[in-house]
């Protein structure tokens, strides 16, 4: 195998997008889902982690 750069593609050049995948029944997951700082509620829907009783569960 030669240079790895020959295998890189630009995702903008792909002929399908996330909406096409979903319409065809495919599952789409965000790479950032559930990543954050649970100790301060960053992965919750709580907007005021200091004053509310939201949990990260």
Swiss-Prot record:
There is a cross-link at residues 50-51 (Thiazole-4-carboxylic acid (Ile-Cys)). There is a cross-link at residues 43-44 (5-methyloxazole-4-carboxylic acid (Ser-Thr)). Residues 1-42, 57 form a propeptide. There is a cross-link at residues 45-46 (Thiazole-4-carboxylic acid (Asn-Cys)). Keywords: Antibiotic, Antimicrobial, Bacteriocin, Hydroxylation, Methylation, Secreted, Thioether bond. One of its GO terms (cellular component) is extracellular region. There is a cross-link at residues 47-48 (Thiazoline-4-carboxylic acid (Phe-Cys)). There is a cross-link at residues 51-52 (Thiazole-4-carboxylic acid (Cys-Cys)). This is Thiocillin GE37468.
